[in-house]
Amino acid sequence: MFVDQITLELRAGKGGNGVVAWRKEKYLPKGGPYGGNGGNGGSILIEAVTNMYSFEEYRNLSFLKADDGQAGASNNRTGRNGKDLVLKVPEGTLLRDAATGELIHDFTKDGERIVVCQGGRGGKGNVFFKTSTNRAPTKATPGKPGEIRLVELELKLIADIGLVGFPNAGKSTLFNTLARTEVKVGAYPFTTLHPSLGLVHQEGMLYQKPWIMADIPGIIEGASQNRGLGLDFLRHIERTRLLLFVIDISGIERHSPEQDLKILMGELLAYKEELKDKDMVIALNKIDQLLPDEREERVALLKQQFPDQEFILLSGLTGEGVDALYDLFKSKLSE
């Protein structure tokens, strides 16, 4: 299950209590205080990792707790510190305070780690309170409670390429062709119900770093007002380096390619106007279903209405035009 939003209560460990104890040895009848300090409670940290793409493993949890510190002991022994709890999250995770909505941290890199809840300090044993005027203190202090925090985790996928388009535009078929995977494909809206990630290797380039591609669920008119799958997945578009609009040029589904592209761009800009500054390419898909003359006519009309856009013709089903798309990725995404 793809889980990209979750609320959790995080509870750091309590510090162990300090103890009152006395040194008891045969030749030291007045051995003095000998009670040790309590150990510190475990803290809760959050760390971003690669190869994790959802919060699925936390979906049935309401809270997470680090270990408490152990109490001190006689012989001036300090209690064991509680073990820290490290919460692993995907790159692209936003951490917010659930009570205030304040952004605590934006995790964008593998290995990025912060302390979210500090463990409580251990209490002091009676050895700590020994002074020149108080040689036999009977005081010890309890451990401090650990911090408790209610947090929200929200994922914005980080990918090189984001596939966006209307339901049934052929995104999933194209995704399968490019990533050599098997995302579910079907002839009904919203076949893709959650973002899918794949690695794109060009033929003969298997030893170079692949591109990460995200297949974003189908967008419909009104998505920016949360219709359809709406805002749940539009946010995953924000962090992609290249937006690949997949448009059904065949007209078989009674779509107008020009109208589809106009609505699609309008929805993205209504969601966040800054998306207009992203690198975009328009993939005119399903060309295998058109005669050459029909292709030329429809492409000419699109270029006339969208003169500033870059178009590429292809078929996710037959693979026609895919090599040219690989070359385009290479030119756009090379560092």
From Swiss-Prot:
Enzyme class: hydrolase
UniProt: GTP binding residues: 165-172, 190-194, 215-218, 285-288, 315-317
SUPFAM superfamilies: Obg GTP-binding protein N-terminal domain, P-loop containing nucleoside triphosphate hydrolases
Residues given in the record as Mg(2+) binding sites: S172, T192
Record key words, sorted: Cytoplasm, GTP-binding, Hydrolase, Magnesium, Metal-binding, Nucleotide-binding
Domain (OBG-type G) ranges: 159-334
Pfam families membership: GTP1_OBG, MMR_HSR1
Domain Obg span(s) in chain numbering: 1-158
PROSITE patterns, sorted: G_OBG, OBG
Keyword GTP-binding: yes
Subcellular location: Cytoplasm
EC nos: 3.6.5.-
A single MF term (Gene Ontology): GTP binding
Primary site of residence: cytoplasm
Listed cofactors: Mg(2+)
Entries under HAMAP family matching the protein: GTPase_Obg
Function of the protein: An essential GTPase which binds GTP, GDP and possibly (p)ppGpp with moderate affinity, with high nucleotide exchange rates and a fairly low GTP hydrolysis rate. Plays a role in control of the cell cycle, stress response, ribosome biogenesis and in those bacteria that undergo differentiation, in morphogenesis control.
Subunit structure comment from the entry: Monomer.
Family: Belongs to the TRAFAC class OBG-HflX-like GTPase superfamily. OBG GTPase family.
Record-given protein name: GTPase Obg
Species the sequence originates in: Chlamydia trachomatis serovar A (strain ATCC VR-571B / DSM 19440 / HAR-13)
Gene name linked to the record: obg
